A protein has these predicted regions:
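Peripheral, non-cofactor segments flanking catalytic/redox cores
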Residues: 1-73
Length: 73
């Protein structure tokens, strides 16, 4: 079976982009949580807002907020 020799490199590059995007997302979630942005939109918590606005399940949303709160300020 012949495989594209650059396919592995493309996968690695895409994975790096996803991780960088996830870091930016978590950072922004931390800022939004600290500023209480969710409350201005009527949500009970940042996790509830993420669940409603972004479509995450409440469990994964809580995990993102938990991780965001652990990041250095």
């Amino acid at each position: 079976m012949n495989s594209d020799p650059t396919l592995g490199d493309e996968i690695a590059a895409l994975a790096a982009q996803l991780e960088a995007g996830e870091y930016r997302l978590i950072t922004k979630i931390g800022e939004f949580d600290a500023q209480g942005g969710y409350a201005r939109e009527g949500a009970l918590s940042c996790a509830h807002w993420l669940s409603y606005r972004v479509g995450l399940g409440l469990g994964p949303a809580r995990e993102k907020v938990r991780v965001a709160r652990l990041l250095p300020k």
